[in-house]
């Protein structure tokens, strides 16, 4: 009986994790273009800083 409950708990946790991942993926997809642009700006800024340091 205890084993059955443990399996059920694991399944529920996995379902919750999958749901979170799906929600995160959706949020990421919505924000990814803005995020990518920001990261590219940071990379470019980082390259400039490295050049300035040398």
Swiss-Prot record:
Compositional bias (Low complexity): 10-21, 29-44
Organism taxonomic ancestry: Bacteria, Bacillati, Bacillota, Bacilli, Bacillales
Site entry: Cleavage: 27-28
A GO BP entry: sporulation resulting in formation of a cellular spore
Family classification: Belongs to the gamma-type SASP family.
Role description: SASP are proteins degraded in the first minutes of spore germination and provide amino acids for both new protein synthesis and metabolism. These proteins may be involved in dormant spore's high resistance to UV light.
The keyword Nucleotide-binding is assigned to this record: no
Region (Disordered): 1-54
Taxonomic source organism: Alkalihalophilus pseudofirmus (strain ATCC BAA-2126 / JCM 17055 / OF4) (Bacillus pseudofirmus)
Keyword rRNA-binding: no
Residue stretches of biased makeup (Basic residues): 45-54
Name of the protein in question: Small, acid-soluble spore protein gamma-type
Alphabetically ordered keywords of this record: Sporulation
């Amino acid at each position: 009986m205890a084993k059955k409950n443990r399996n059920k708990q694991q399944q529920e946790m996995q379902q919750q994790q999958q749901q979170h991942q799906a929600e995160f993926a959706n949020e990421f997809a919505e924000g990814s273009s803005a995020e990518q642009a920001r990261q590219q700006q940071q990379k470019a800024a980082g390259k400039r800083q490295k050049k300035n340091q040398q």
